A protein has these predicted regions:
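Non-heme Fe(II)/2-oxoglutarate
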Residues: 2-145
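Generic beta-strand or strand-like secondary-structure segments
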Residues: 136-140, 155, 186
Length: 267
């Protein structure tokens, strides 16, 4: 999302209004496969499947809370660069079932591509349905941070167990890196994982002198890192622009997340 997508003539964009318009366009069949207003899509899934699930998700919304679990708003939260945050049971029960089933079914039938340069995962950038999930989360992100935020982009990162590629085993891990500017706040939403499994992301306590550097070729010692993990239907939130973070080799069969990125609204 560029600056021009976020504001026009210094008029702040109402992202929740855009979300409601997108739902209406899904309902009446007028939605573009490229999205609408601030919500841009890069569509990879058959659009009839996206439309069906967008309409299902809309039907589970609960007033001002949308698809979110209202109980998440019953408390205040603290997060800073040395204190990552985990919130469980983020979406209401009916919304969560639709989200979980959407990713499982589309992975199982081959609609998501497998593998990228970084990890052994099913991937997609700004996938249509995931953008709805991201916009639905915005009120909770603003509640947590107590400031206006804007959704930037999403990346589907549904990790799967090691597979052989060209005769070599490919490890399922996440190399050490820092995030780019549009990831001011990195939110890993855990779609699903095997019950009882644990695969933490390690966030280095050391602040890097240069932000947004990207890939690093060393692993910070674990004793200097904060391990972060949550349950299925939870979010993990931290600032990864100048703190290296990584995952070790995955011990479970799968770990499905979608990365939902946000940044502060410029004033």
């Amino acid at each position: 999302v560029s600056a021009s997508d976020v504001s026009n003539n210094n008029t702040p964009i109402d992202f929740m209004s855009d979300l409601n318009e997108v739902y209406e366009k899904f309902k009446d069949g007028s939605i573009s496969i490229r999205g609408h207003k601030s919500m841009k899509f890069i569509n990879k899934i058959p659009f009839n499947i996206v439309t069906e699930n967008a309409n299902k998700l809309y039907s589970t919304r609960q007033g001002k809370y949308g698809a979110l679990n209202p109980k998440c708003f019953d408390q205040t939260y603290h997060i800073d660069e040395y204190n990552p945050l985990v919130i469980n049971n983020v979406y209401n029960e009916n919304s969560y079932k639709i989200i979980k089933d959407y990713f499982h079914s589309n992975i199982d039938c081959g609609n998501f591509a497998l593998g990228d340069r970084q990890a052994n995962r099913y991937k997609s950038n700004n996938e249509s349905f995931s953008r709805l999930v991201q916009y639905e989360l915005l009120p909770l992100v603003e509640h947590v941070l107590n400031k206006k935020m804007q959704p930037t982009y999403i990346y589907v990162s549904c990790y799967t167990k090691n597979q052989e590629k060209d005769g070599e085993e490919r490890k399922t891990e996440l190399p050490p890196h820092t995030d780019r500017p549009d990831c001011e706040y990195t939110i890993s939403y855990i779609i699903d994982k095997p019950e009882g499994s644990n695969w933490p992301i390690y966030v280095d306590k050391t602040k890097q002198p240069v932000k947004n550097k990207g890939r690093y070729w060393f692993y910070p010692p674990k004793e200097n890192c904060i391990p972060v993990d949550g349950d299925a239907n939870s979010l993990m939130m931290f600032n990864g622009t100048d703190h290296i973070h990584y995952r070790e080799e995955m011990p479970c069969d799968f770990y499905y997340i979608v990365l939902l990125h946000f940044r502060s609204v410029e004033t």
